[in-house]
Amino acid sequence: MSSPAPSTSHNAANSTQAFSLKTRRPIDEDDLLTAEDREAKSTVEKLDCATRRRACKNCTCGRAELERQLEAGGSQVMGAMPPGGCGNCAKGDAFRCAGCPYLGMPAFDNAVDGKVKLDLTDDI
């Protein structure tokens, strides 16, 4: 007599699996955080006017003079490099240094005094 064929039940196959959707437990989100993650992060504020909209009381970067000139009705002209300038003032905020007096202003062209170049050529 021959021996019976081995049984291929699904329960036997599932018991050897490392992962099963039926036995999966939900992960507690609080267990994923460490004690360091739970601590409140504090940002250190600079004490200069690069992070503010107005010049600080003891401004040394030239922003106070620039604001006084604009309030008096003068126009903002970039003649020479600002003090401590990196040369990227005209490129926009992404390229400006923290002490740039032009922080928050749109990009401009050093050679042109506030004039917009229009391309009047036809696209056809």
UniProtKB/Swiss-Prot annotation:
Biased composition (Polar residues): 1-20
Keyword Iron part of the UniProt annotation: yes
Binding-site list for [4Fe-4S] cluster: 86, 89, 97, 100
GO biological process, one term: iron-sulfur cluster assembly
Compartmental location: Cytoplasm; Mitochondrion intermembrane space
UniProt motif Cx2C motif 2: location: 97-100
Region (Fe-S binding site A): 49-61
Sample GO molecular function, one term: metal ion binding
Cofactor(s) named in the record: [2Fe-2S] cluster; [4Fe-4S] cluster
Ligand binding ([2Fe-2S] cluster): 49, 56, 59, 61
Positions of region (Fe-S binding site B): 86-100
Region (Disordered), start-end ranges: 1-39, 40-124
Subunit relationships: Monomer.
PANTHER family referenced in this protein's UniProt entry, alphabetically: ANAMORSIN
Family: Belongs to the anamorsin family.
Protein known as: Anamorsin homolog
Organism: Trypanosoma brucei brucei (strain 927/4 GUTat10.1)
